[in-house]
């Protein structure tokens, strides 16, 4: 009975978090007056959308930028991943940590940091006399800025695939007369194809859903993307709910088409080593190529991490931007202002930390139950539970925000979380649910199928087996996922902009508003603290995962 209740409650929570927002987007897109309670004029919003002169620019800009980011991410991440996975590099874990930082840094903060560094009268021009304003505010500049945040997904996909599969098959090919290049081309690269395809698709998906970078750089570059268009339809008066819903469906269609196209190009084949479980991969010695390889890794790390970090820290300790880079202009007053009891910073920080903690606890519990019901209990309807729990991984944040607005801003609800902090909590939980599902699912696969049946033989109920056996064993993975959720939720931007109640700010909204108001130093001081907090949480999560792996 208790298990049936848990199954029903889990499915109901997933329907509320994931399915209903998507259903209401679809209803609003089909019936333009649905928000007013009318089902008339079906598909009446489509002609207005097609007549929008901005539509070709939004769709074309989204596809151009996303394709460029995916391509350049492969160009950077593939060779670096090969260096890390196939060869013996000095301090290999240091490179992994270095390339985690761009993925951890909120893209909008990176974009603002690049602006301060490269624009006219920016730090580069002050220090060297050069400026890259024209490159920064262009399509190519937007692609590069986004790529420096996104390429780690390709790097880690490639390097982890190589570290897992080893290089023994390539060595066998060399023994049988193949050249190094031929062995790589015909043996190693095909083994990499699934991981490379997954990384490329993820890079494309992350690019099409990005809001902060095109919002910060796009207007001066003449580039508009679908995410920015959706936000404008909700932020500008009069609010265009049908237009926002239709653009959200279009954005989802782009993501699904990319997934379908990749499956057509790559196929559903799986590449498997026939040698059994690979042993530890120590990597091939590079010899005289070690220094060039290290320099290449350091150059990418310097651009992806060093430039934004230095720009961020410089801005946070400069009294005024007009004062330039000088010792006389150094101050800590921006950091002191964050802790001013009469300011908005402490309130924003408290709001973000509370929401992040709530999100981590809720999705941790829901993700644990979903993974356990699907993989261990194998309940009826487990396919639906699995699909709903992982679907948010393919949903852009702006789409989730639109769906929640359309769902809860309806007159028939007796009580609604609309225009309260509960909306932010719902959005964070929806977006970040796949993290604990994947982490716990991976841990459950490693446990094997015999532990819980053994507990059942000795009289334990399914819930007792979950509480006394399964939970202690998967807890390190669950805690790591919850820390990741906390770190990401504490700096989420687009849903915070769409759903924050009037007069309430999160850390991300605070930073964004500081730039809009010209208080750049205080915004970057908050960004520095946010990045440091996220990095500490990320390192803690990695340590927990490593401990679980060793155990």
Where are these regions (language model features)?
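Juxtamembrane helix-boundary/capping and inter-helix hinge elements in multi-pass membrane proteins
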Residues: 87-91, 163-168, 178-180, 221-222, ...
């Amino acid at each position: 009975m208790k298990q049936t209740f848990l199954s029903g409650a889990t499915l109901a929570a997933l329907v509320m978090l994931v399915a209903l927002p998507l259903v209401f987007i679809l209803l609003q897109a089909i019936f333009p007056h649905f928000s007013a309670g009318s089902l008339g004029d079906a598909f009446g919003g489509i002609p207005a959308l097609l007549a929008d002169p901005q539509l070709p620019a939004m769709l074309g800009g989204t596809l151009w930028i996303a394709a460029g980011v995916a391509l350049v991410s492969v160009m950077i991440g593939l060779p670096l991943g090969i260096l890390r996975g196939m060869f013996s590099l000095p301090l290999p874990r240091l490179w992994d940590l270095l390339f985690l930082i761009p993925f951890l840094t909120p893209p909008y903060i990176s974009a603002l940091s690049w602006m301060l560094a490269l624009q006219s009268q920016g730090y580069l021009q002050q220090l060297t006399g050069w400026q890259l304003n024209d490159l920064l505010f262009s399509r190519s500049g937007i692609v590069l800025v986004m790529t420096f945040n996104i390429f780690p997904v390709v790097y880690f996909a490639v390097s982890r695939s190589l570290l897992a599969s080893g290089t023994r098959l390539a060595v066998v090919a060399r023994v049988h007369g193949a050249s190094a290049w031929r062995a790589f081309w015909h043996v190693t690269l095909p083994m990499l194809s699934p991981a490379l395809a997954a990384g490329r698709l993820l890079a494309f998906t992350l690019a099409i859903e990005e809001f902060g970078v095109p919002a910060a750089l796009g207007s001066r570059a003449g580039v508009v993307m679908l995410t920015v268009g959706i936000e404008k339809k909700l932020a500008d008066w009069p609010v265009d709910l049908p237009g926002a819903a239709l653009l959200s469906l279009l954005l989802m269609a782009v993501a699904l088409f990319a997934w379908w196209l990749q499956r057509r190009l790559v196929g559903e084949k799986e590449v498997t080593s026939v040698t059994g479980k690979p042993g530890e991969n120590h990597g091939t010695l590079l010899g005289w190529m070690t220094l060039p390889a290290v320099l290449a890794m350091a150059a990418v790390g310097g651009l992806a991490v060093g430039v934004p970090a230095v720009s961020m820290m410089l801005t946070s300790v400069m009294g005024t931007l007009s004062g330039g880079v000088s010792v006389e202009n150094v101050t800590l007053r921006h950091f002191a202002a964050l802790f001013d009891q009469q300011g908005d910073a402490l309130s924003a920080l408290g709001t973000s930390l509370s929401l992040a903690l709530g999100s981590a606890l809720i999705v941790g519990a829901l993700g644990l139950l979903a993974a356990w019901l699907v993989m261990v209990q194998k309940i009826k309807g487990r396919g639906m539970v699995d699909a709903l729990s992982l679907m948010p991984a393919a949903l852009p944040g702006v789409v989730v925000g639109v769906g929640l607005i359309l769902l809860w801003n309806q007159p028939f609800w007796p009580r609604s979380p609309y225009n309260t902090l509960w909306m932010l909590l719902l959005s964070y939980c929806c977006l970040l649910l796949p993290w604990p599902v994947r982490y716990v699912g991976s841990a459950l696969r490693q446990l094997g199928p015999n532990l819980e049946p053994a507990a059942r033989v000795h009289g334990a109920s399914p819930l007792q087996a979950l509480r006394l056996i399964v939970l202690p064993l998967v807890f390190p993975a669950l805690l790591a996922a919850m820390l990741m959720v906390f770190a990401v939720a504490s700096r989420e931007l687009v849903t915070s902009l769409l759903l924050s109640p009037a007069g309430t700010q999160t850390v991300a909204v605070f930073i964004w508003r500081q730039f809009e108001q010209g208080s750049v130093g205080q915004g970057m001081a908050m960004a520095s603290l946010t990045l440091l907090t996220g990095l500490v949480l990320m390192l803690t999560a990695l340590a927990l995962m490593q401990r679980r792996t060793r155990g």
